[in-house]
């Protein structure tokens, strides 16, 4: 845009003679050419002004054919003025066209400036180019299109229109006498095609001109739509031009709606008249624009002079002229509004006889009846009617609640004052403000009084209401008075200064007033809702608060009564529901011991947890005998490694459980430890005793810290006697053992992670495998009902050999004929004789001391499973030839330990004692074949028995 203004001095060269020449050429070449040069000049002036006023750039952007079609469509509309100016410029610019193509570049500059410059510049250019009327014609068409393009560029603020309209110069150039200058090459721009002048032959130009006209018309339509929107948003000229369009022409919407039709008509015109279609269309546009622009010139006689004076800057005079028109229109509108308001104020019925309570209602009605306030009247109707309804509903005697009325009056005054702040409604607002107050005082003053008078009347009427309603409302009335003063000052300034105000100021005031009115209406709606409702809402709130307090107390008492009743059972319920106790305790012992040992804060809680874990492990062992046997084997192994004193210490503690342990014994053991066994001397099921004894064995290990050696010695003796009686009655026979030890089918191995493990490395891992679980279950079940214990050592060794034939397989793939058997049964016994004899003493001591229970417990499992890993020591129980002696000894040893261990001593007797000893002390199952003489074993057991008693005397200071 700076570039165009720099080219302004070239555009100043145009003279009115060129305008006259262009007009004469237009007359000769146009079908309807009957206009004189004098007629064209004012039309051209008005056209330039209308171009500045109107945002319809598409016509400027479009080709001359499109301009002509638009002018035909828009008869009596504001756009043809623009188009007429273009046509006049084209006729005037026809004289501008020089013979040399070098002059075309300054012509572009002059064209661009002609778009921005005033009429005398274009006239000077035309006078400069008076020679060559036909050349002038062609170049004036180009100039017109280019000028329109630059006008749209100026209006739009972008170069999009320049290329399109310059592209239309091609279509215009072939109409001229010089084809080289008329045609241009189009280069695509960001918003359209940019034209570059290229000499082209006439026929090719004619063909391309049609196509380019079509494309340019399409681009012009698009750019017109976009440009009109941009103008309305961006440029101040759009703000100046929009009111003129609406006021003088009122064709903004219609012209934009017809853009698509214009493009089609432009195409048709270009087809019919590729060369001369532009000229007659231009002349018709001139006539249309002259009619409309002459009317505009009558209202704005000084517009052309201001434009002529400002050659380089057209924005200022155009804005001033437009502002003058707008201000004059606003003045007329304000005068009309004032007259109308005066008539209405006089016609209003003056009802001052009614009470003051209803005066505000009358003011509301008067406010509602104002018709000129299109938006604001509707909003006021809604707000005031809503307020009146709330008043009537919430406060039937309105005098009882004076504050809401005063507030409504104040708000009505504020809303009216806010309405009066708008420029067009400035006079109306002041008169409207005076209306309700004068109605209260028998409107005798003129409604056209100054806003200061209105303020006085308002203050008087409000003071009267205040005397009736209360002094509190006076404070609130002062604020609306101040608002009225401010707004009235704005109204007076708007009335007086409308003539001198610029158009930008007018729009700013209008926008601000609209925003203020909208904000005031919204805020007042909220204020009315907040201020009219508070009396019922306050009363309701106080009532609800009182009722809430009373009801709340009642409800709280009722709830407390309801909850106090279940609170007594709730405490134990919550304790029972705790996951540990509910899952682990299955008896009513918790209810008996809530306060002492089973409470969460009791010191026995840790002991209880340990016992419950032990019981759970026992129950899991009962579910699968394989698991129980494996646990027994592991316990047996660990018991041998522990020192004797520790084992004895634990055995004694196992006989004296803590209070929760006693409860568990009552719970889970059929024979409680605290009661004598005389009533129950015999048992048919050894498994029950085994399971219960395993419980008793496993519990003291977990409760070792919590239990103390506080139990008397007599109880231990009772337990020993008890276990001896049970063991004597439950000794299995060798025949049953033979049936057990010869299974029909070896069960398949269930885990294969040990298949590459050597027999020496089995240790306790083979015990942990499930390969022999089925056999162990059968073995444990076979003990039920077995009573005889007479057997020979040969039978024991045979059964043991057959038993180990089955158990000797190191992997599932090993057969009964595998090498493992030969190694298992054929290795020399001499190696382990010394080991067994040397270790039986310690093993038996451990078995007597309390780990003996674990050792026997595990020796059974070894005989059942594999007898490979045998840390247990139960040989003295097995090696007695006389069953009575063995039963007595075993009963003395294991009566206080566990029923399971006591019952396991008898089946162990049927097996080879040397095998048990070997397997007990050797990790290699193959070495278990070596046997000890029975006499040696008997002597060893006797020695161990004596040594065990001595050690018990040393530890506990008592004799057995």
Curated annotation (Swiss-Prot):
Q: Where is this region: Disordered?
A: 30-185, 206-318, 363-607, 619-760, 812-960
Q: Which GO terms describe its biological process?
A: eisosome assembly
Q: Sites of the modification Phosphothreonine?
A: 467, 675
Output compositional bias ranges, type Basic residues.
947-960
Polar residues composition bias: residue spans: 33-53, 84-102, 115-135, 206-226, 236-258, 371-386, 431-453, 531-557, 619-628, 641-656, 686-708, 725-737, 823-836, 866-884, 909-927
What's in the keyword line of the UniProt record? Cell membrane, Membrane, Phosphoprotein
**Membrane topology annotation:** Peripheral membrane protein
User: What residue spans carry the Basic and acidic residues bias annotation?
Assistant: 144-154, 285-296, 388-413, 455-484, 558-567, 746-760
> Where is the sequence biased in composition, kind Low complexity?
298-312, 420-430, 587-602, 709-718, 839-848
Q: Which GO terms describe its cellular component?
A: cell periphery; cytoplasm; eisosome; plasma membrane
Localization per Swiss-Prot or TrEMBL: Cell membrane
- Phosphoserine PTM positions: 48, 220, 235, 238, 319, 339, 352, 434, 461, 630, 758, 816, 818, 855
- Give the domain of life: Eukaryota
Record bears the keyword Cell wall biogenesis/degradation? no
Function of the protein = Important for the biogenesis of eisosomes, large cytoplasmic protein assemblies that localize to specialized domains on the plasma membrane to cluster specific proteins at sites of membrane invaginations. Required for efficient incorporation of the eisosome component PIL1 into eisosomes.
Family that this chain belongs to: Belongs to the SEG1 family.
Q: How does it assemble?
A: Component of eisosomes, large cytoplasmic protein assemblies that localize to specialized domains termed MCCs on the plasma membrane.
- Protein name, entry field: Eisosome protein SEG1
| UniProt organism field | Saccharomyces cerevisiae (strain ATCC 204508 / S288c) (Baker's yeast)
Question: Encoded by which gene?
Answer: SEG1
């Amino acid at each position: 845009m700076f570039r165009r203004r720099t080219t302004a001095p070239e555009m100043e060269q145009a003279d009115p003679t060129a305008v006259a020449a262009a007009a004469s050429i237009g007359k000769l070449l146009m079908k309807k050419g009957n206009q004189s040069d004098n007629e064209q000049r004012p039309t051209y002036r008005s056209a330039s002004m209308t171009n500045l006023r109107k945002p319809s750039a598409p016509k400027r952007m479009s080709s001359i054919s499109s301009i002509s079609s638009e002018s035909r469509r828009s008869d009596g509309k504001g756009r043809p003025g623009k188009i007429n100016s273009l046509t006049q410029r084209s006729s005037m610019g026809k004289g501008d066209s020089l013979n040399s193509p070098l002059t075309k570049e300054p012509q572009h500059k002059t064209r661009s400036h002609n778009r921005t410059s005033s009429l005398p510049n274009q006239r000077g250019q035309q006078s400069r180019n008076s020679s060559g009327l036909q050349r002038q014609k062609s170049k004036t068409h180009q100039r017109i299109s280019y000028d329109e393009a630059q006008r749209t560029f100026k209006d739009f603020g972008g170069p999009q229109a320049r290329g399109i309209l310059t592209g239309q110069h091609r279509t215009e150039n072939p109409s001229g006498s010089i084809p080289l200058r008329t045609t241009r090459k189009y280069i695509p721009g960001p918003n359209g095609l940019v034209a570059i002048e290229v000499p082209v032959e006439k026929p090719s130009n004619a063909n391309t001109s049609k196509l380019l006209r079509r494309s340019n018309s399409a681009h012009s339509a698009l750019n017109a739509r976009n440009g009109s929107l941009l103008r309305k948003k961006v440029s101040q000229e759009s703000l100046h031009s929009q009111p003129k369009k609406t006021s003088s022409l009122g064709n903004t919407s219609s012209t934009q709606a017809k853009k698509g039709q214009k493009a089609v008509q432009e195409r048709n015109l270009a087809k019919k008249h590729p060369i001369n279609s532009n000229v007659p269309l231009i002349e018709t546009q001139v006539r249309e624009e002259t009619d409309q622009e002459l009317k505009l010139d009558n209202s704005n006689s000084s517009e052309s002079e201001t434009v002529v004076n400002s050659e380089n800057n057209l924005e200022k005079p155009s804005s001033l002229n437009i502002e003058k028109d707008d201000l004059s229109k606003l003045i007329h509108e304000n005068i009309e509004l004032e007259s109308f308001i005066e008539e209405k104020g006089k016609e209003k019925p003056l009802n001052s006889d009614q009470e003051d309570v209803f005066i505000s209602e009358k003011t509301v009605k008067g406010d509602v009846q104002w018709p000129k306030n299109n938006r604001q009247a509707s909003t006021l109707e809604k707000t005031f009617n809503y307020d009146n309804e709330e008043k009537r509903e919430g406060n039937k005697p309105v005098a009882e609640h004076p504050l809401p009325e005063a507030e409504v009056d104040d708000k009505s005054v504020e809303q009216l004052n806010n309405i009066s702040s708008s420029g067009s409604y400035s006079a109306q607002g002041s008169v409207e403000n005076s209306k309700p107050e004068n109605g209260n005082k028998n409107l005798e003053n003129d409604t056209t009084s100054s806003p200061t008078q209105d303020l006085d009347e308002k203050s008087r009427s409000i003071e009267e209401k205040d005397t009736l309603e209360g002094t509190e409302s006076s404070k609130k009335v002062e604020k609306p008075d101040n608002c009225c003063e401010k707004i009235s000052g704005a109204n007076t300034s708007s009335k007086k200064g409308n003539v001198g105000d610029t158009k930008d100021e007018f729009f700013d005031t209008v926008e601000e007033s609209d925003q203020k009115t909208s904000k005031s209406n919204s805020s007042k709606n909220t204020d009315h809702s907040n201020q009219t409702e508070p009396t019922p809402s306050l009363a309701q709130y106080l009532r609800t608060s009182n009722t809430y307090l009373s009801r709340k107390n009642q409800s709280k008492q009722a709830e407390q009564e309801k909850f106090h009743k279940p609170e007594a059972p709730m405490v134990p319920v919550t304790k029972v529901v705790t996951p540990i106790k509910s899952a682990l305790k299955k008896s009513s012992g918790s209810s008996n011991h809530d306060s002492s040992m089973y409470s969460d804060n009791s010191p026995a809680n840790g002991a209880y947890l340990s016992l419950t874990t032990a019981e759970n492990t026992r129950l899991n062992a009962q579910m699968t005998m394989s698991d129980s046997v494996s646990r027994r084997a592991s316990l047996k192994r660990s018991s041998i490694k522990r020192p004797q004193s520790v084992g004895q210490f634990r055995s004694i503690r196992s006989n004296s459980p803590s209070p929760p342990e006693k409860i568990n014994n009552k719970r889970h053991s059929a024979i409680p430890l605290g009661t004598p066994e005389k009533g129950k001397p015999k048992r048919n099921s050894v498994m029950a005793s085994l399971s219960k004894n395993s419980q008793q064995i496993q519990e003291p290990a977990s409760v070792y810290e919590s239990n103390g050696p506080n139990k008397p010695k007599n109880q231990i003796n009772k337990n020993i006697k008890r276990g001896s009686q049970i063991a004597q009655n439950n000794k299995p026979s060798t025949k049953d053992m033979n049936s057990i030890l010869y299974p029909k089918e070896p069960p398949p191995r269930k885990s294969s992670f040990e298949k590459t493990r050597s027999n020496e490395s089995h240790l306790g891992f083979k015990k942990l495998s499930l390969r022999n679980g089925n056999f162990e279950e059968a073995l444990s079940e076979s003990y039920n009902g077995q009573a005889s214990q007479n057997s020979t050592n040969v039978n024991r060794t045979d059964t043991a050999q057959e038993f180990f034939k089955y158990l000797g397989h190191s992997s599932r793939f090993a057969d009964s004929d595998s090498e493992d058997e030969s190694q298992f049964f054929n290795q020399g016994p001499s190696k382990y004789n010394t080991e067994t004899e040397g270790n039986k003493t310690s093993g038996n001591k451990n078995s007597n001391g309390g780990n003996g229970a674990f050792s026997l417990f595990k020796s059974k499992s070894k005989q059942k499973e594999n007898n490979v890993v045998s840390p247990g020591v139960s040989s003295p129980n097995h090696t007695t030839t006389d069953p009575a002696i063995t039963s007595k000894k075993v009963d003395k040893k294991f009566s206080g330990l566990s029923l399971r261990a006591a019952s396991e001593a008898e089946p162990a007797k049927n097996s080879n004692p040397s095998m048990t000893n070997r397997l007990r002390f050797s990790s290699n199952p193959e070495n278990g074949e070596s046997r000890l003489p029975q006499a040696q074993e008997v002597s060893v057991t006797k020695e161990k028995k004596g040594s065990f008693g001595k050690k018990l005397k040393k530890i506990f200071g008592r004799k057995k």
